Amino acid sequence: MRTADDAFSDAVSGQALTLLVRALPAIKSAPQDLDARLEGQLGMWLSISGSSTGVGVGVSHAIGHTLGGSYGVPHGITSCVTLPSSLRWNASANLNRQREVSRLMGKPEALAADLVADLVKRLGLPGRLRDVGIRREDLQAIADHTMHDAPVRTNPRKIEHPSDIVEILELAW
C-alpha cells in the first residue's frame, strides 16, 4: 500500500504473500499439516520484515489501529475488514502495484481487492465492519480518530480529510 519502491521489501513481501496465500487455506482445511503450518509461519515472519525497514503501511493499518484500540477488534481481523476497501480506494494511485499483488496471488487478471476479499471469505473470517460489531453511525468518529494516525501519511493516495477515510469505511461497512 505504500508509495515508494523498495527492492528488498518488495522481494520479501512478495515471497511472504506467495507463501501465505498458499498456506492459509491449506492450514484451514488440514490444521495438522505441519508443512503448511511451517510455510504459513515463514510467510508471517517475512510479512513483518517490511516494518523493520521503515516501509509505510497506509490507511488500512491506520484504520486498524483505531478499530483495535477503540473498538476491541483484533489486529489480524482489522486487516480482513479494511484491506479490500483500502485497496479499492487506492487503486487510482497504485494500480500497477496492485496488479503485482494479483500476480503473486496467482490471478493476474483479477483485482487485488477482490482476491483479498475472496481469501478472507474462504478462510471463514469476517470481511465487513458490521461483521465485527462496528455500527455505521461510528464511521465518522473512526475516521476522525484515524486521521491522526501516522500511517495515514504513508498512504499511496493522499488522504486530505476525514471524509476520505469515511469513503473507505463505507466500502468496508
What are these language model-derived features?
Residues W45-S79, D149-R153:
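Glycine-rich phosphate/pyrophosphate-binding beta-alpha loops
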Residues M1-V55, P156-R157, S163:
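Carboxylate- and glycine-rich phosphate/diphosphate-binding segment that chelates Mg2+/Mn2+
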Residues K107-W173:
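C-terminal charged capping/lid subdomain of soluble metabolic enzymes
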Residues G72-R130:
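Active-site pocket-lining segment
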Residues G40, H61, H75, L83, ...:
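Buried hydrophobic positions in well-ordered alpha/beta secondary-structure cores of metabolic enzymes
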Residues A11, Q15-A26, E39-L42, L46, ...:
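Alpha-helical scaffold segments in soluble metabolic enzymes
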Residues A7-T18, L38, V57, I77, ...:
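Alpha-helix N-cap/helix-start motif at coil-to-helix transitions, marked by capping-box chemistry
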Residues T3, A23, I27, S47-G50, ...:
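Alpha-helix C-capping/helix-to-loop hinge sites
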